[in-house]
Amino acid sequence: MEKTKYNFKQISNSRNVIMGIATILILIFHSQTLYLHKIFNSNIIQNLITFFRDTGNVGVDIFLILSGLGLYYSFSKDSNIKNFYKKRLLRILPATIIVAIFTTVLMEGSGFGYFLRRLTLLTLFTGEDVDFWYFSLIIILYLLYPLFHKVIKKFDSKGIIMLIVPILIINHCIRVFDITLYKNIEIAITRIPVFIAGIYLGKKSSEGFKIDKKILIPILLLLSIMILLLYIGIFKKCAFVIRYVYFFISIPIVILLSFIIKNNDNIVERFLIDIGKYSMEIYLIYEYLVKNCVNLFVYHDKYNLAYYIAVIILTFILAHVLKQISNNISSKLVKNK
């Protein structure tokens, strides 16, 4: 009988592998000038490759789901809010500050004032920053997490509605009454619901909640329908809806991937786990490099493939260095307290 059941614990067990897949999707999405589609003469194949690249930002939504899931486990083990904030901020701030100093002050010459605005999340609301919005969002979600956790833990599935509906209403009000502000922050605030869904999945995972595997069929069907609708461009006339469409794409992807992944410790899974370990550092570094290193390359092939391979290798090297430095800083800060 157990063989006919899908256990939500599989999401937690597969979390690191899925994180690696999400990281690769983000790399693909930020490869806007990688012209591999030009290899093919078929317009259909070109369009499919372009569509796959452009929908790679679903990796961000997957990040948020897995983040919410992981936080549920972490907070359930230690619900001391002070300890929670300390752990979370020590995880994200050292690497973020290092990259922010390097890119903002040293490379861009934007000055210390802009660096402070970036660090205090103000650039998210003013529309000045298109690179650090994710980390601004994550810090905000960390601050709100204890409330989210309490609601989901107490009200279960009803808690999702209690949290998401007010957020959707607030988002809509901002869009109606201050469209400029909405355009600045929609990339972040429209993704809060998927983070909340991740918390709920964390609860179900920690409980070992099981469903009949047959339910995975309509989940796959939902995913297929949403991807098809996105591909044919049905949401182009209402662009603000697209962010929410990824809600209904990312959750099925996470569930189906956790079902497929067998955790057999094979070479592919180990590779994805290694990438997933550096997901934050890669996210911080890659987009900046891919935008700003192009002038360092004298020769470009017509597909820009050599350029992207070089940038990816450099990203992985710098991500490893950044993680080591930020971990050392975090360790010293913990010892000094």
For every predicted segment, state its role.
Residues 1-170, 213-217, 266-268, 274-278, ...:
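Membrane-cytosol interface segments of multi-pass membrane proteins
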Residues 4-5, 174, 183-196, 203-281, ...:
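Alpha-helical transmembrane segments and terminal signal-anchor/GPI-anchor hydrophobic tails
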Residues 14, 57-61, 127-139, 183-199, ...:
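Membrane-interface micro-motifs in multi-pass membrane enzymes
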Residues 30, 283-286:
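Histidine-centered divalent metal-coordination motifs
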Residues 30-37, 104-108, 150, 175-179, ...:
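Transmembrane helix-loop junctions and nearby membrane-interface residues
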Residues 70-73, 149, 199, 203, ...:
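Short glycine/serine- and small hydrophobic-enriched flexible loop segments
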